[in-house]
Amino acid sequence: GIPNASPTLADNSVSFRVINQIFEGLYRLDKNGKPALALAASEPEEKDGGKTLIFKIREDANWSNGDPVTGHDFEYAWKKVVDPKTAAAYGPQMEEIVKNATQILKGEMSPDELGIKALDDKTLQIELENPVPIFKELLTTGTFFPQNQAFVEKQGDRYGTKSDTLISNGPYKLENWNGTNMTWDYVKNPTYWDKKNVPTEKIHVTVVKDTNAALNLYNTNKLDRVELDGEFVKQYKDDKNFHKEATGRSVYMKMNQGKDGVKTDLANLNLRRGLAMAIDKTGMVNTLLANGSKALNGDVPGDIMFDPETKEDFRKQNGDLLKFDQQEATNAWKQGLKEIGKTELTLTLTSGDTSLQRKQTEFIQNQLEENLPGLTIKLKNVTNQASFQADVTQDFELLLGGWGGDYQDPLTYLNLFLTNSPGNHTGFSDAKYDELVLGAKGKLSADPEKRWQALLEAEQILLKDNAVLIPLYQGGRAYLQKSNLKNYTTYPIGSENYKWIEKN
């Protein structure tokens, strides 16, 4: 199902995928993954060396209830995102970038001081702390989308929890979603400014947890696209409608070191290092997934982001930070047990409950118990919604998670583990790490090479020095898609785009 469809509160890839079809911001990624003008009528007028941007909003941009989209809708939405009372998971996206966002998020300034202002209904002024190379990409993501204040306030807490409590300004409207059901429809939005380029009247979505069941629906023409893994890839790899591609999804396990001042056993670095080096990722990727995923020994995935000067891949540059090493894992683990005065430990691993997630967690359980003496792993497979919830409330010991990234820059991965990031949920906090990552968001923007070095160093601190995560793999995507389905647009990083989808 959909955890929620409010752009302010969204904190997971499922919600953002929905938001991307029914809402729109100043820019939208084009078919090649580059930001293209959307609600912005033209590129902004720049003042003060690029620190002030003035956007004209399209005259024909409207909400699905007929209201025009205005600068006030942006001003309202952005101020809500940085308001500490909202506790938006993505508030920190604006920190060090939009003027005063950092102080507002800390509660030192009022949200009204944020550097955004509607000069009139169709003119929007944005003030930045620093002109940032990734700002246009950020504007294509849900956190920076407008919201209709009158509608949102009328709905109150119900806003975005089912299709009746939403209005849209994007290519589609969401229909037939009651908040918990596993099917819904995207229906073409008649008030969308670019509706002439939206060829499809209706897209029906069904959530199918079991790949076998999904294949049956595909083979009986009830589904047009189905994602595959494991033995199904081997079975269908020669089918003319089979496709495989790499993505920018970084999949890892989080370890809970403690919260609210109460530490767990996993606050011990050696135990974390032992866990992080005890899984044969290549085995997992080749046998279980077989979908184009690759073993990953860092947080930032490979082949997508490159050094601005040398053009070298970030992942290759930073190398393997935590890789499978049975001997080293066992040694670190034994040392850690000694340090906490125990001879055995039981840990629970929380994850979603699709057939693939069950297979993965069984594989992980097997590897960890086999390679780390005295360890028992219990599995807790719950709905994806419950798994997101466990992450958000930091109510887990080990959690199978990951991050798809929002824009093509290492910052989108490393940002998550800042001390005050609402997406952190590990108990990790490191002053040097914060300094490097905040620098890369803000004041190092003017020196791309120095900024890049800061990001490389931050990842080393996160994994080599602190073993905050157990990196597993860079996600791939294998799927069958009917040959008459065209323009289903996906990107290595960022939400799919259904705007141009058509079926002949």
Where are the regions a protein language model picked out?
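Gly/Pro-rich hinge or "lid" segments in bacterial periplasmic/extracellular proteins
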Residues: 128-198, 202
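Long beta-strand-rich cores associated with HINT superfamily self-processing modules
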Residues: 479-504
